[in-house]
Amino acid sequence: SYAHSDNSPDAGFGVIRGDYYYLPLLQLGPDYAPYANLLQSDVLVINIQTDKVEKLISETATHLAMPSQPSYNSCIFMNENKDIYIMCAGYFGFNPENTHSGLVCIPNKGELAQTDFDSSKSWDISSTPIEGTPYKPNTIYSVVYLGGGKVAAFVSAAELNVKDPFTDKNGIAVLMDLNARTIKKIDGIPYTDSHSVGIAKYKDLVVFGVSGKEKRGLFGYNPTTGTTQQLLTTTGGADFFYAFE
């Protein structure tokens, strides 16, 4: 078993690269949080022809934990070089002693023997300022890769927690740059709660699901023009959407 301290390693969403399926293991404890004695990111490398686990690789240097996310398959992605990036939410901001979150990377080295994490490409965002705000992230909720090293994301700021981190409007829509290691607030999208943080691409827009204090629904962001608009108003919080023509 690849589980730590229980019977399930808690598989997240995976991705296929070449002949192998990369399956992150969230390794969650009974409180749906990482084990304090296993602050790392584990990934199984599985042969898609034989379904055999070829190796288990772990990123232990940065202590980024909870790789992938069971709610959003976009939390694991490949860039143009087929380097795999995996979002790590850590403690979802519930542990003030551990606000480490961000992304870990498995570069495209080609050969199975060379396949492993590169901790120099990991990014712990907890010390990165969110430009346009006075905050730094205490967790990351969701991501969508846009290309060119740019990532649309929802991150959280502890200072925005007033009463209840489940319902407080602590989620900030941001644009992250994997190369420059910067995080910028996207103006025009309200702060949201931790359960309305879905992101998806639709045509030339990035669509954010929002449950704001005054506005709720789907908000579109055009990364080319930098403009935002509310696309749909809802009564409750919006998370997923399906578009058809």
Give short role names for the model-derived ranges.
Residues 6-18, 28, 69-84, 135-148, ...:
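Structural signature of eukaryotic scaffold interfaces centered on beta-propeller domains
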Residues 1-73:
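Long, acidic/polar, low-complexity amphipathic helices and coiled-coil-like
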Residues 36-51, 98-112, 167-179, 221-222:
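Beta-propeller blade signature
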Residues 133-211:
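Loop/turn-rich, solvent-exposed surfaces of beta-rich toroidal or solenoidal domains
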